Amino acid sequence: MGQKINPLGFRLGTTQSHHSLWFAQPKKYSEGLEEDKKIRDCIKKYVQKNIRISSGMEGIARIEIQKRIDLIQIIIYMGFPKLLIEDKPRRVEELQMNVQKELNCVNRKLNIAITRISNPYGDPNILAEFIAGQLKNRVSFRKAMKKAIELTEQANTKGIQVQIAGRIDGKEIARVEWIREGRVPLQTIEAKIDYCSYTVRTIYGVLGIKIWIFVDEE
């Protein structure tokens, strides 16, 4: 059987960079890791609660965390930041307060910045959310996959592969369905590939969505 390695970890240091940048003593490392998870969960929960879109998408591509001795810098890359910022300018401050309360950090300053990504549908996380929304609304999985591929074609990507696994369309036996458009060279380390795995809960059970997007060759 072919061994499947995570395409992001496989390319760390060449085409992929870390989403968390900080140093810690070996004994304190696990605390820092837990802190990162708390920050990410807190932000996602806040965005879910405050953004109401018809498709139920959060639109978060990734959250980068940089830590120094006296400062935690958080950059949220979003596909549709207007939905969070335009309603109330106070929202970012409120989010900052929430994260600070969650972390209970007294002697460190917290700074949150929101950056818009140029092609939202060229990002696998946002696409996976889109497909999840479609599947929850009982759209047929093939239709959802094809629509996702159409959206990425507008974002000038070189190739995409979408895979859905589980009880598709409520069938008794779980199966894996996939579709590929263009090139997706998973073995080439120089190829910049974005990847995301996403779990969606439907009325029939849990489905797994995996998306590989071939962005560019370095």
From Swiss-Prot:
InterPro entries per the UniProt record, alphabetical: KH_dom-like_a/b, KH_dom_type_2, KH_sf_prok-type, Ribosomal_S3_C_sf, Ribosomal_uS3_bac-typ, Ribosomal_uS3_C, Ribosomal_uS3_CS
Location(s) in or outside the cell: Plastid, Chloroplast
Principal subcellular localization: plastid
UniProt keyword annotations, A-Z: Chloroplast, Plastid, Ribonucleoprotein, Ribosomal protein, RNA-binding, rRNA-binding
SUPFAM superfamilies found in the cross-reference section: Prokaryotic type KH domain (KH-domain type II) (SSF54814), Ribosomal protein S3 C-terminal domain (SSF54821)
UniProt-listed GO biological process terms: translation
GO cellular component, one term: chloroplast
GO MF, one example: structural constituent of ribosome
Domain of life where this protein originates: Eukaryota
Similarity section: Belongs to the universal ribosomal protein uS3 family.
NCBIfam families on file: rpsC_bact (TIGR01009)
Subunit structure: Part of the 30S ribosomal subunit.
Name recorded for this polypeptide: Small ribosomal subunit protein uS3c
Organism field: Lepidium virginicum
